[in-house]
Amino acid sequence: MAANPSGQGFQNKNRVAILAELDKEKRKLLMQNQSSTSHPGASISLSRPSLTKDFRDHAEQQHIAAQQKAALQHAHAHSSGYFITQDSAFGNLILPVLPRLDPE
């Protein structure tokens, strides 16, 4: 049984059309970017992964900050000790502050 050549031809035409549309859009964006070089604030960055990464990092930072705040409030409410928020090599959100006692 042979492969359907008309179906394959349609797929190739569809791919070519999609690639042509993408190329046209890319050229349009590049032209906009080049025309706005006189206005540095109006330039369009074509690197979306860095924007997505920055957004993800910011969201992660906010989530960690919320967790730190909750852990700190819980520790202060249920303990007589003193705690601070600080990055820890072991992944702890808060660290206890231990007083130094003079040796007797």
UniProtKB/Swiss-Prot annotation:
Its main location: nucleus. The modification Phosphoserine is found at residue 50. The keyword RNA-binding does not apply. Keywords: Acetylation, DNA damage, DNA repair, Nucleus, Phosphoprotein. It is found in: Nucleus. The modification N-acetylalanine is found at residue 2. Disulfide bonds: none annotated. GO terms for biological process: DNA damage response; DNA repair; double-strand break repair via homologous recombination; mitotic G2/M transition checkpoint; response to ionizing radiation. One of its GO terms (cellular component) is site of double-strand break. It comes from the Eukaryota. InterPro entries: SOSSC (IPR031821). Component of the SOSS complex, a multiprotein complex that functions downstream of the MRN complex to promote DNA repair and G2/M checkpoint. The SOSS complex associates with single-stranded DNA at DNA lesions and influences diverse endpoints in the cellular DNA damage response including cell-cycle checkpoint activation, recombinational repair and maintenance of genomic stability. Required for efficient homologous recombination-dependent repair of double-strand breaks (DSBs) and ATM-dependent signaling pathways. Component of the SOSS complex, composed of SOSS-B (SOSS-B1/NABP2 or SOSS-B2/NABP1), SOSS-A/INTS3 and SOSS-C/INIP. SOSS complexes containing SOSS-B1/NABP2 are more abundant than complexes containing SOSS-B2/NABP1. Interacts with INTS3; the interaction is direct. PANTHER family: SOSS COMPLEX SUBUNIT C. Belongs to the SOSS-C family. This is SOSS complex subunit C. The gene is Inip.
